[in-house]
């Protein structure tokens, strides 16, 4: 069975404690009061000492971590392991189920490009993918990179998740970026496929890169000492010195680089949530100074796609909140040259555009559902429809520009992933490949899409997966995020089936702050409106109870990163509503983090959360920040995770929050912290580790809804 040895080793390595034994005593977090005065407002932080002042040093040199902090984190890990020890067999069982259902790891179907077919697959027993190709007209497979082999002997290994072809346009090179330490400082490698020689690694890459259209240069984004993407360099694919292409001096902006699908140019883009600016690198002369398209203007967002003799511009210009499409000539991509092509339509959010030789494909979100729309050069639109109440659609990022087909994937919470080719001339679709899932019968499950009324009357989309015939109301797990305009995809998860088979309703709350209902849905939770996200999440939980889909007090909340605001706020506002909460690398110490100029995300975050240097923003953040608002209440069981090398949301966020929750809770339910002492924000992505981590969270959720932690039901 896939990765079974690793998974069983994970379970058996945990400390043993029989079910029914008393809970061990939690670590005592010393209270060292620190008074923080800002804008004439004073507050006391008893756990500020957990935030090491020179924390960036510990990212590159973990041994420099204050011994008292390390000792505390080790004690928290030991306590977490001891409390969860009675679930070891359950974790192993869940891990086996997830692995068994996930044995079809063939990856995406081969993508044609010129004379080759490219694809990746996770081979039986492997933890990382292998990238391959073979001649389009037939011939043997060629291994481009076997990441399971490359990861051998490394404690941490994560491949950069870029939506770019990793091979060069002339098919002579293959490039990849990997984080080998957990601090998200990627190394970029370029391999000559003719000789098999890999050039010396490019250090301190942010993860984004693109090979130039002439296949002579690799363009990459540099990560500085503060972990910010500040420069774009180019280097010969054969090695040599780095040449500065562009430097971004405003810390409020991120940088990215990508090659046009047509190979007609490269785009270097500086952006944040409020503004963007793109420079064009000519395919004819990749060493020339990039040409600015349209200078940055506050509130103006745009991006470009190269399409034949002009650019397609996706933009919010002219009040197009949900974006529109315009065109611009190749020799003048400034705003004054933009011309309307596809006008804005209220409630139709244009999320993504991809140009092909004879057509343009775009993804639009309409009423919290993605739609695929294809336009020819005559401007006529064709819409690909899906007959399910909730689902996910994604465009193939490596689709061939010269093709007359649009390749996309489709899935839903009860429908495994299907890869489909849509013929632009005929409108006929053909299924390229379907994900095979063992021990799974689609008809045993159903998907529902509901609308939960929030406190202000706004209807919040709510997606549910449940197994047919299960008694209700029962337990539920509610996922949420609600930040940065990112949409929670209604995708297929083999892991969620294990919960559904145990009577759980698996739900996703599409709260404001996400992008499911367009840019306006995102903007409805910005700055002085952030509490809408928390209210929406609570409303979704209440709706589950009201519709008798979940039992009162039997709901587990689950989120990640910026979703910590959503979970922490919901626990503070309605602690009795929840049986438990899983908070992965949570953003919960909002006020302190936004005042920390050493955090690489702070300045770019002001368009999202607001600038706390302004009194009204400070006071508003202080009124919802989870850490600041923990109070004496019957909190549910909590499992928080952190990464010691996380440079986005430091380990201390979760550690301080857990300490304050444990100090204030009146319920007796365990408040747990697990810190990956060798990991960062994302965690390791080996197959065995991902499955084991998921099994731990699920076992915690099952235990939480049982209400039994020490052999007796814990009363609120």
Across the structure, where does each feature detected by a protein language model lie?
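Active-site-proximal cap/loop segments of hydrolase catalytic domains
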Residues: 509-716
């Amino acid at each position: 069975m896939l990765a079974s040895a690793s998974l069983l080793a994970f379970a058996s390595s945990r400390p043993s404690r029989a079910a029914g034994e008393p809970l061990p005593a939690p670590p005592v977090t010393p209270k060292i009061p620190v008074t923080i005065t800002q804008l004439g407002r004073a507050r006391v932080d008893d756990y500020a000492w957990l935030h090491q002042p020179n924390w960036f040093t510990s990212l590159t040199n973990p041994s420099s971590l204050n011994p008292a902090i390390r000792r505390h984190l080790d004690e928290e890990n030991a306590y977490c392991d001891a409390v969860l020890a009675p679930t070891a067999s359950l974790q192993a069982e869940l891990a086996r189920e997830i692995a068994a259902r996930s044995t079809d790891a063939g990856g995406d179907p081969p993508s044609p490009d010129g004379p080759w077919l490219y694809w990746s697959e996770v081979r039986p027993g492997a933890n990382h993918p292998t990238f391959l190709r073979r001649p389009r007209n037939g011939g043997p497979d060629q291994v481009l990179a076997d990441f399971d082999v490359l990861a051998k002997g490394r404690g941490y290994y994560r491949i950069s998740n870029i939506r770019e072809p990793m091979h060069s346009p002339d098919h002579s090179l293959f490039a990849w970026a990997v984080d080998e330490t957990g601090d998200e400082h990627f190394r970029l490698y370029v391999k000559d496929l003719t000789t098999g020689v890999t050039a010396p690694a490019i250090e301190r890459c942010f993860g984004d890169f693109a090979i130039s259209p002439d296949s002579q240069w690799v363009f990459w984004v540099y990560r500085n000492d503060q972990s910010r993407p500040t420069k774009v360099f180019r280097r010969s694919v054969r090695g040599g010195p780095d040449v500065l292409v562009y430097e971004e001096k405003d810390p409020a902006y991120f940088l990215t680089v990508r090659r046009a699908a047509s190979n007609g140019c490269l785009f270097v883009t500086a952006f944040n949530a409020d503004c963007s600016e793109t420079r064009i690198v000519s395919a004819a002369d990749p060493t020339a100074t990039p040409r600015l398209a349209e200078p940055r203007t506050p509130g103006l967002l745009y991006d470009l796609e190269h399409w034949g003799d002009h650019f397609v511009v996706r933009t919010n210009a002219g009040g197009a909140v949900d974006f529109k499409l315009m065109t611009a000539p190749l020799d003048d991509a400034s705003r004054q040259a933009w011309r309307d092509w596809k006008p804005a339509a209220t409630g139709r959010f244009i999320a993504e555009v991809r140009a092909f030789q004879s057509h343009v494909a775009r993804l639009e979100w309409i009423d919290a559902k993605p739609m695929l729309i294809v336009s020819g050069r005559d401007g006529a639109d064709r819409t690909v429809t899906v007959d399910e109440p909730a689902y996910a659609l994604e465009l193939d990022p490596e689709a061939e520009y010269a093709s007359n087909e649009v390749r996309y994937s489709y899935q839903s919470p009860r429908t495994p992933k299907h890869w489909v080719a849509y013929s632009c001339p005929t409108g006929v679709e053909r299924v390229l490949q379907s994900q095979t899932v063992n021990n799974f019968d689609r008809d045993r499950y159903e998907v529902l899409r509901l609308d939960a009324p929030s406190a202000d009357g706004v209807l919040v989309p709510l997606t549910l997966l449940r197994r047919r015939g299960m008694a209700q109301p029962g337990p539920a797990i509610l996922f949420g995020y609600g930040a940065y305009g990112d949409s929670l995809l209604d995708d297929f998860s083999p892991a969620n089936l294990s919960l559904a088979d145990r009577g759980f309703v698996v739900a996703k709350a599409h709260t404001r702050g996400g992008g499911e209902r367009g840019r306006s849905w995102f903007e409805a939770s910005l700055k002085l409106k952030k509490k809408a996200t928390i209210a929406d999440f609570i409303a979704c939980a209440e709706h589950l109870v009201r519709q008798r889909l979940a039992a009162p007090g039997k709901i587990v909340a689950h989120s990640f990163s910026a979703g910590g605001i959503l979970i922490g706020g919901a626990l503070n506002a309605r602690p009795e509503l929840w049986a438990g909460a899983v908070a992965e690398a949570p953003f919960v110490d909002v006020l302190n983090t936004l005042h920390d100029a050493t955090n690489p995300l702070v300045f770019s975050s002001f368009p999202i959360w607001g600038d706390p240097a302004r009194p009204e923003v400070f006071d508003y953040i202080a009124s919802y920040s989870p850490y600041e608002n923990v109070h004496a209440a019957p909190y549910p069981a909590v499992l928080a995770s952190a990464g010691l090398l996380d440079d986005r949301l430091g380990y201390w966020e979760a550690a301080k929050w857990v300490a304050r929750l444990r100090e204030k809770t009146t319920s007796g339910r365990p408040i747990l912290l697990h810190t990956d002492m060798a990991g960062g924000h994302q965690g390791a992505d080996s197959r065995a580790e991902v499955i084991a981590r998921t099994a731990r969270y699920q076992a915690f959720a099952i235990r939480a809804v049982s209400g039994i932690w020490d052999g007796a039901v814990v009363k609120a």
